[in-house]
């Protein structure tokens, strides 16, 4: 059995239907705001429901400086990259080659429909 190592959550980042960052998301949740509405990201007429919680008006280019990362990134990958960047900033971590083996990411997501 391997020994358990302690970890610390040092930064949080979010891209959600109620906010494009953690503070906005949290404030909107506390205020009881919902991100649900009519689906606009794709034609949902063939589905039994036309209601979803989509991330709207999100532009990863305003957060991610390295355009090469975004060139081939899907929409959901852009969410993850932006949330990761926010988490790093929140933690005050600037990854360098000498420290990259000492930190990691845990990324969670709900359902995202990919478009080709």
Q: Can you annotate each of these PLM segments?
A:
Residues 1-113:
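Conserved "HGTGT" condensation-loop signature of ketosynthase/thiolase-family condensing enzymes
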């Amino acid at each position: 059995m391997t020994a358990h190592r302690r970890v610390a959550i040092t930064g949080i980042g979010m891209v959600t239907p109620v906010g494009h960052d953690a503070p906005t998301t949290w404030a909107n949740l506390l205020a009881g705001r919902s991100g649900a509405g009519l689906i606009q990201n794709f034609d949902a007429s063939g589905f039994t429901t036309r209601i979803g919680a989509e991330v709207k008006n999100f532009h990863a280019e305003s957060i991610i400086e390295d355009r090469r990362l975004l060139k081939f990134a899907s929409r959901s990958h852009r969410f993850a990259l932006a949330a990761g960047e926010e988490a790093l900033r929140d933690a005050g971590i600037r990854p360098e080659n000498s420290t990259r083996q000492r930190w990691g990411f845990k990324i969670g997501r709900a359902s995202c429909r990919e478009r080709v």
